[in-house]
């Protein structure tokens, strides 16, 4: 079974969507008969979560890309585990594993593929790492892949799209109650509900939606907007809500651990991002058959088809956003038909099974 081992790595102390995706991939591969192990920093959030759900964890400090004790630890694990591949979700861990794998190849003539998972790209990408250090770099969208290929020196075969896998069965069976403070607010503020789950940061487009809401309120005075998330823009958004006269229309819910209860009480789900590698909220909304409106930023168009599975508007265009919201409210049957078609598409494109099958193909199963 040692030859069927896949080592996942992450050098972050925190946990977010990418780390949760790594743990989900580990569980899926384990269920498919593979041995998996997570190499990560001791006392990190991902280490705790992995242990809580019964995954194998090995602590490596990954202090930086050239941390010799981390190199030594990775080399020793290779010697004992004989892995089929590394799947690296962080920066320091990816370089450590790539360099150690190169050393193993020089010393022992054994090639160990190293796959680097990247969910962002800032600045101009340099070709050396992507052409020579990593077997392939995996991106969650074709849009993000295109940001790497602006450097014509990067081999396109080295950058591959791996759409995230979503556990739709778990989402469908999620029976958690809506947090009490949200349920109480909705009870005292009747009207159609718009839901938006995202970190409170400028590029997520909350201010665009608020300005659109001020327009919609003229004909739909009871419209409600639930903003789920936390982040640095909270004071700015609170001030904007007050300035636009939307105090009775908008609730900043804070972080919600389970998004399904929020979506189930919503009439519309929105993703007004100004920049987005892919987005997950709109995929989950479509699965739950909530009429969905998104911007056309980044990789979002890969997740929704305009006037087929939802509506898509120009990023940052307040007037278009207001018009789209009004259309959904005025055409509930057509909007619901879009949502049902959206469910079929996202299940096909973003299922856990599709993600796992592609991973197994990559690592040579």
What are these regions (language model features)?
Residues 106-142:
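A conserved, positively charged/aromatic
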């Amino acid at each position: 079974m040692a030859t069927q081992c896949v080592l996942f790595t992450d050098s972050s102390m925190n946990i977010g969507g990418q780390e949760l995706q790594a743990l989900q991939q580990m569980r899926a591969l384990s269920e498919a008969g593979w041995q998996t192990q997570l190499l990560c920093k001791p006392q990190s959030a991902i280490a705790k979560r992995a242990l809580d759900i019964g995954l194998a964890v090995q602590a490596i400090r990954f202090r930086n890309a050239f941390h010799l004790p981390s190199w030594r630890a990775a080399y020793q694990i290779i010697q004992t585990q004989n892995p089929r591949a590394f799947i690296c979700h962080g920066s320091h861990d990816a370089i450590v594993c790539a360099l150690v794998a190169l050393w193993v190849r020089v010393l022992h003539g054994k090639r160990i593929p190293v796959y680097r998972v990247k969910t962002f790209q800032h600045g101009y990408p340099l070709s050396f790492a992507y052409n020579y250090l990593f077997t392939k770099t995996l991106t969650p969208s074709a849009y993000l892949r295109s940001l790497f290929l602006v450097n014509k020196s990067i081999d396109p075969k080295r950058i591959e799209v791996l759409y995230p896998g979503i556990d739709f069965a778990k989402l469908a069976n999620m029976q958690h109650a809506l947090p009490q403070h949200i349920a109480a607010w909705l009870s005292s503020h009747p009207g159609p509900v718009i839901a938006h789950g995202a970190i409170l940061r400028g590029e997520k487009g909350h201010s665009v939606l608020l300005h659109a809401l001020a327009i919609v309120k003229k004909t739909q005075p009871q419209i409600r907007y639930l903003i789920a998330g936390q982040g640095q823009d909270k004071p700015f958004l609170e001030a904007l809500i007050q300035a636009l006269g939307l105090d009775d229309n908008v609730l900043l819910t804070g972080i919600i651990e389970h998004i399904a209860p929020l979506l189930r009480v919503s009439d519309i789900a929105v993703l007004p991002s100004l920049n987005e590698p892919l987005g997950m909220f709109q995929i989950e909304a479509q699965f739950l058959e909530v009429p969905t409106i998104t911007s056309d930023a980044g990789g979002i168009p890969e997740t929704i088809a305009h006037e087929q599975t939802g509506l898509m508007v120009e990023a940052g265009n307040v007037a278009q956003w207001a018009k789209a919201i009004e259309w959904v409210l005025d055409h509930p049957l057509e909007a619901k038909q879009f949502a049902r078609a959206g469910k079929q598409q996202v299940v096909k494109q973003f299922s856990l099974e599709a993600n796992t099958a592609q991973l197994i193909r990559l690592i040579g199963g």
